[in-house]
Amino acid sequence: FVEQSSDNIWQAVCNAVRDAINQSDINPIQVKGLGFDATCSLVVLDKEGKPLTISPSGRSEQNIIVWMDHRAITQAERINALHHRVLDYVGGIISPEMQTPKLLWLKQHMPNTWANAGYYFDLPDFLTWRATGDDTRSLCSTVCKWTYMGHEDKWDASYFRQIGLEDLLEHDAAKIGRYVKTMGEPLGHGLSARAASEMGLIPGTAVSVSIIDAHAGTLGTLGASGVSGEVADFDRRIALIGGTSTGHMAISKEPRFIGGVWGPYYSAVLPEYWLNE
């Protein structure tokens, strides 16, 4: 099991922003906007938006199942045995690193957490919610890790029924995402007064829809013009994004269904392009 604390991460973000302002010697009014990227880890909050434990230890501050956590191997195997058409968009086989197997694990192994949960976020979307109070989810996170059908602009209800998570779609899927927008779109009324105070910034500063960390790197890498200044041909490029893990990322105008390769994910990095990982 690999677990983290959303309170700890948020405090680190605020400290980093304050340090950046101080080291840059600028006035907060000069900051025109904020964008967030983060790992595709699962954040669980209660109905008041407070941390809710995902840990067998019962520690409430441990409310994040980190992306690399493989506690949901059995749940992933059960989902894969059902061969739902949604799996065509994750390379034919869902990984225990994705969110629906982890959510199924929580439902089966931590019923009190399941009963009291009010929000399930991908970590990048938690950060934008914490910054603005707007619970809009990113198309990047929901398509790549939550089985949202981006090309159809909907959750596939038959998939959630089949795997036993149909309750997540109640109340217009409020717990996992009523509203889904493309990365970079503005959120709500910008930075909330509370978050602005914590960061040392100005309330109302623009905040954009988030993106997963490797996918932010993909956008920058594939879009690079190079020393010759040539225009990027996305259909002929692949990005190698390294960190705690390493991802090979390619986008195309047409969907590519390749067994064992994640995707194709619609508009996960660039609008109207399909991503394979």
Positions of PLM-derived features:
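Glycine-rich phosphate-binding/catalytic subdomain of phosphoryl-transfer
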Residues: 3-277
